[in-house]
């Protein structure tokens, strides 16, 4: 639960960086 939740947050932030980058 914790890992997946954290991974989800990180994934969204990462995708945001990729889109902007």
Curated annotation (Swiss-Prot):
Main location: secreted
Entry keywords, A to Z: Secreted
Family: Belongs to the gastrin/cholecystokinin family. Magainin subfamily.
Keyword Secreted included in the entry's annotation: yes
Purpose of the protein: Has no antimicrobial activity against tested bacteria.
One term under GO cellular component: extracellular region
Subcellular location: Secreted
Tissue occurrence: Expressed by the skin glands.
Presence of keyword Secreted: yes
Name listed for the protein in its UniProt record: Magainin-B1
Lineage: Eukaryota, Metazoa, Chordata, Craniata, Vertebrata
């Amino acid at each position: 639960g914790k890992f997946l939740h954290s991974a989800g947050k990180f994934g969204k932030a990462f995708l945001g960086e990729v889109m902007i980058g």
